[in-house]
Amino acid sequence: GKHNISQEVEKIHTFISIHGKMFLRTNNETAANGMFLLNKDSTKIEIEYALKSLIQRCESFHNTRKATNIVGVKFISSESGSGFQDLYRVHVLFGKILSYYAVTSHLDIFHNIDMGGNDLDRFIELNRDLCERMSKIKQNVLKAAKVLNCNLGAVEFFIQNNELIFLELNPMWGGHASKFGFGNDKMQAYLKKNRNQLIKLIPNIYIFMDRRTYYKDLFQWIHYYCSTNL
C-alpha cells in the first residue's frame, strides 16, 4: 500500500529523540546490508532518505522473500564505558554448540576484518571470558535457535549485566573469520605466532580456525544426528 513517508519520518525522529541512536534496517539481511545508523544529528531529510532506500530495497526482495520488512531498533551502547562494541556469535547445529567467539571494535558498525592491534587485548579477554561462561549460557543460546525453528545457524548477541541480548540468527559460513581468521593481517599473524601460549586462554578461537578438524566434527555430527533421529 501507499506509505505515509512524512508520518513515519516523524515517528523515527521521535524514537531517536528518546533513545539517542538507532538502527533502521531490513529484518532479514546480514553483514550490515540494508542498515542505516541514525542519531540525534540525523536530519529529517537523511531519515527520509534512509526510509525510502529501505522501502525500495524491501520491494525488490518481495518476490523471493515475502517476509522482508523494515524494523527500527535502539542502538545498544557498550556497558563498560570502554568505548568498545562487543559482539558474540555461537554456531548451533541440531541442538549442539559447534563453536563460538567474540569480536570487538571501537566502531559502531564493524566486521571481523576491522579488528586490529588496538583490539587484540580486549579480543583475548572477551574470548577467555566466553569460554568460562559458556556452560552457563549454553541452554539459553540453544533455545534462541529453537524458538526460531532453526536447526542450523549462528546466534548473535550482546551481553549486558550478565544477561544475553539476542540480535539475530545468521548464516554460519562464508564470512571473513571462517575463510581467513580473525582481524586484519597483523592480528592474524599475531594469533598464529603466539598460538602455543594463547590456545590455553582462548581454545575456542583455535578450534574454529582448525578447519580440517572442525568440518570433520561437523559432518560426523550431521551423520550421527541423521542416523539416530531421521
Identify what each model region corresponds to.
Residues N33, N39-E132, K136:
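Phosphate-binding site of ATP-dependent enzymes
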Residues E29, G95, Q160-N162:
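Short strand-connecting beta-turns/loops that link adjacent beta-strands
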Residues V141-A145:
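A conserved acidic, glycine/proline-rich C-terminal tail/linker
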Residues G1-M35:
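A conserved helix-loop-beta module that forms one wall/lid of the active-site cleft
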Residues N27, F75-I76, H91, E156-F158, ...:
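Anionic group-transfer/hydrolysis microenvironments
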